[in-house]
């Protein structure tokens, strides 16, 4: 079941298992923000997102939130929530992010159970180009519990794909 709830930004917790850049499960929001700002993987691109968002927060794409006990974890929409937390000073940043849009302190969120959230995330990101082939396989195996693909096995055993990003393509996976 899904429902829309208005939640306070200060209560929202960033998802450590985000396929964009998974981090230690005990990491804090600040740890995730610091990593996103470093953006060594070039997957977060927060300044670009801030520019694309325009002058205000667009409510047409709601963050997907799953409650773990009383903790609302942001499963989808972490980049937008990071920008919101920066905008309101809920995390510390050592650099200026230009073009931060206006974001209210309370926002509507799609609150659902983990299974629905994961299905929605896979539908939204799995084949849209926002994830690499390796990201998708990692998500399917580590988050959704599917068997490890041969492509992911090859990466885990050799590191070949991450060392050669030109191999991180669907057609390469299909050939393997």
Label for each model-derived stretch:
Residues 59-128:
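A short, basic-hydrophobic beta/loop patch
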Residues 1-16:
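N-terminal extension/subdomain marker
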Residues 16-37, 99-175:
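Amphipathic, charge-rich alpha-helical segments that serve as recognition/docking helices
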């Amino acid at each position: 079941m899904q429902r829309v709830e208005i939640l306070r930004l200060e209560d929202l917790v960033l998802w450590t298992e985000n396929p964009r850049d998974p981090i230690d499960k005990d990491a804090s929001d600040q740890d995730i923000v610091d990593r996103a700002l470093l953006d060594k993987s070039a997957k977060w691109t927060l300044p670009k997102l801030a520019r694309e968002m325009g002058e205000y927060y667009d409510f047409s794409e709601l963050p997907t939130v799953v409650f773990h006990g009383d903790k609302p974890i942001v499963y989808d929409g972490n980049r937008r929530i990071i920008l919101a937390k920066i905008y309101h000073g809920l995390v510390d940043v050592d650099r200026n992010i230009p073009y931060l849009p206006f974001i209210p302190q309370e926002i509507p969120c799609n609150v659902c159970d983990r299974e629905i959230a994961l299905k929605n995330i896979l539908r939204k990101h799995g084949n849209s180009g926002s994830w690499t082939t390796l990201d998708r396989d990692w998500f399917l195996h580590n988050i959704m519990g599917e068997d490890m693909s041969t492509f992911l096995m090859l990466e885990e055993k050799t590191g070949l794909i991450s060392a050669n990003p030109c191999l991180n393509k669907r057609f390469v996976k299909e050939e393997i």
